């Protein structure tokens, strides 16, 4: 019976020695995520248990959604009895209790922005209490109403075709839900011809008819509010389009023929007004005689003719002279 008592006594003393030589830091944070509207103030609760000494240090850091804890960036830290805010949130981050040496290390973040959404780490170090790292995690979501969505349209908007209407907000937390509705008193599309996805914001319209034309509205909503956009859908009949195309082609053909006929008639009228060409002395043909040669030949011909006309008189005079000589 003595040995169990001795064993219990020894174990108690050993446990006390371990506890005194180094206590485990215990950090407590809320287990539920925190959601706060944009522009408001968030209080991120953090408490701890340890025997605060000269080596006590506290650090708050931030991790963006989807990134590992190793990618955290400091928000503020307390060491050597002084508080040091740092980073892009330095002017909006303070401690609710300063100095945080009484077991409370709550972080107060003012004027919340969408970029503040993420995970916040409350880290307490108090050497020689190294048995745990004293880390607590808090998830913060900054609530933002949906921004004005953008409506878009794609597909074949003719009779019998299909069209896809899109709707998307650039901002909104939590993510908005999208709902499409048709405005006016137009008949409701047949079941199955109008399918929408509330998550992606897409509306699929199949087997379009002329009655599918109209105004469609998309409403993006979350717990912070709603916003909407509208789109006008115009369904055309392909047969009417072909008839219109044929008519336009015929009209263009008639117009071109009219222009061609007008130009031809005008050309003929202008041609009749032009004077007829006459032959000029300066114009030479390939088989024509040079002007100088023709004039010389003409002069010789005239001279010969003149001699022929005078030849009888000359002959008589010669004969008379000859007769007189003989008489002498």
Swiss-Prot record:
Transmembrane segments: 245-265
Major location category of this protein: membrane
Domain called Ig-like V-type: residue spans: 25-138
Pfam family, one: Ig_3
Bilayer topology: Single-pass type I membrane protein
Compartments (UniProt record): Membrane
Domain of life: Eukaryota
Tissues in which the protein is found: Expressed in the stomach, colon and prostate.
Protein name: V-set and immunoglobulin domain-containing protein 2
Designated gene of the protein: Vsig2
């Amino acid at each position: 019976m003595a040995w169990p008592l001795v064993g219990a006594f020894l174990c108690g003393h050993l446990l006390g020695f371990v506890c005194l030589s180094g206590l485990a830091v215990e950090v407590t944070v809320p287990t539920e995520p925190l959601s706060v509207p944009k522009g408001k103030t968030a209080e991120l609760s953090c408490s701890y248990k340890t025997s605060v000494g000269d080596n006590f240090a506290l650090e708050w850091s931030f991790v963006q959604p989807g990134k590992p804890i190793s990618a955290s960036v400091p928000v503020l830290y307390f060491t050597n009895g002084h508080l040091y805010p740092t980073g892009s949130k330095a002017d909006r981050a303070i401690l609710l209790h300063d100095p945080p040496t009484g077991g409370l290390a709550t972080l107060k973040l003012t004027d919340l922005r969408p970029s503040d959404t993420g995970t916040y780490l409350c880290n307490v170090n108090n050497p020689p209490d190294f048995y745990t790292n004293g880390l607590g995690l808090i998830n913060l979501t900054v609530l933002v109403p949906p921004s004005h969505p953008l409506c878009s349209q794609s597909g074949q908007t003719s009779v019998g075709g299909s069209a896809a209407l899109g709707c998307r907000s650039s901002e909104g937390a939590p993510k908005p839900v999208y709902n499409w509705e048709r405005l006016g008193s137009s008949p409701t599309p047949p079941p199955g011809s109008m399918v929408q996805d509330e998550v992606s914001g897409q509306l699929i319209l199949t087997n379009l008819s002329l009655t599918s034309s109209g105004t469609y509205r998309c409403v993006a909503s979350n717990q912070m509010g709603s916003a909407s956009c509208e789109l006008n859908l115009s369904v055309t009949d392909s047969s009417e389009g072909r008839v219109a195309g044929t008519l336009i082609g015929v009209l263009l053909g008639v117009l071109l023929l009219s222009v061609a006929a007008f130009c031809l008639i005008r050309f003929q009228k202008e041609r009749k007004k032009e004077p007829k060409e006459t032959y000029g002395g300066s114009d030479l043909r390939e088989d024509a005689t040079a002007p100088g040669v023709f004039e010389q030949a003409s002069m010789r011909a005239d001279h010969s003719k003149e001699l022929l006309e005078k030849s009888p008189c000359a002959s008589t005079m010669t004969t008379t002279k000859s007769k007189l000589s003989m008489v002498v």
